[in-house]
A protein has these predicted regions:
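Alpha-helical transmembrane segments of multi-pass membrane transport proteins
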Residues: 1-313
Length: 313
């Protein structure tokens, strides 16, 4: 069979399997195993366990569970609420201040967690109800969180960049560095548009009637400083050549857990167990996808689909 036609059948089969509700990793394994059985026979199946293990036998993968623990431990506390409240106090009289507060809190939380879903959940829990109370349209409230949540993919430490770096054998440190300027640029553009659109509409009811004193503005800053220190410390350790991304992730995870326990009183073993359990589930899910993608890639190469597409292009 023509490899290009076979590639189209593989792509269609993958889409159908994934749309059937099967998990991504299992879907990739089903498609890969099926096509290998049909075209290569039973002998090819002997290599699947070796490929699965080989894809996971990578020191760089240690960064994934560590950064996920960072995000889970922070998301289980009031850290997101504190970030949001601090920005809201300083920007309360600025047109579109709540939207800007949402975006700023999302950017900072993304730099701590590296996860878009965790960012949306932590900041949206506080931001959306407050914006509704102030009179913002639901679309603006949800849109600010959705836009800010996407920053978790760009702003380091990004779990998505780690997975991409491992899959393409690209330097994770360089990927992180490449995401800093685009991430900050997006934050700035989002904030500038929010300020302009609110100012142009002239809707004064969106401004808070409460005016915070300088004392109230400064007294909340100590709650935010530990997280800023972690962000700066993690980035400095990576780009200063002090530690690798995996080693930095381990230190960051430990510091975030200590902050969650000491500052936010996360003493209850059940709460800590929930953090570790959720982190483990998410880590295993991502690792399984990476391993299954390795088998899928082997199948494409074994059936000469990759080579045929490269020549055709």
């Amino acid at each position: 069979m023509d490899p290009i036609l076979l590639g189209g059948i593989v792509a269609l089969s993958t889409i159908l399997v994934l749309f059937s509700g099967v998990s991504v990793a299992l879907g990739l394994l089903i498609v890969s195993t099926g096509f290998l059985l049909i075209f290569d026979g039973l002998r090819s199946l002997e290599l699947i366990p070796e490929i699965l293990f080989g894809k996971l036998d990578n020191f760089a993968l240690l960064a994934i569970p560590m950064f996920i623990i960072m995000g889970s431990s922070i998301a289980s506390t009031r850290a997101g609420a504190d970030l949001y409240e601090a920005l809201e106090r300083w920007l309360t009289r600025v047109p579109g201040g709540l939207v800007i507060s949402n975006l700023g809190a999302c950017a900072l939380f993304s730099a701590m967690s590296g996860s878009s879903p965790a960012t949306c959940a932590a900041i949206g829990k506080m931001g959306i109800p407050e914006m509704r109370k102030r009179g913002y349209p639901d679309g603006v409230a949800a849109g600010s969180i959705a836009a800010g949540g996407t920053l978790g993919i760009l702003i380091p430490p990004s779990v998505t960049m780690i997975v991409y770096g491992i899959a393409t054998e690209t330097s994770i440190g360089r990927l992180f560095l490449a995401g800093v300027i685009p991430g900050l640029l997006l934050v700035g553009l989002f904030m500038a548009w929010s300020l302009y659109s609110t100012w142009k509409s002239g809707d004064q009811q969106l401004l808070s009637s409460r005016v915070y004193t300088w004392k109230e503005k400064f007294e909340i800053l100590p709650r935010v400083l530990p997280f800023l220190a972690i962000i700066i410390g993690v980035l400095y350790a990576m780009y200063g050549g002090i530690a690798t991304p995996s080693e930095t992730a381990a230190v960051g995870a430990l510091l975030c857990l200590l902050i969650a326990v000491i500052i936010y009183k996360l003493w209850n073993p059940k709460d800590l167990w929930v953090v570790l359990r959720d982190s483990t589930k998410e880590s295993v899910m991502i690792m399984f996808i990476i391993a299954a993608a390795g088998v899928f890639s082997y199948m494409l190469s074994s059936l000469f689909i990759t080579q045929a597409i490269a020549e055709w292009i």
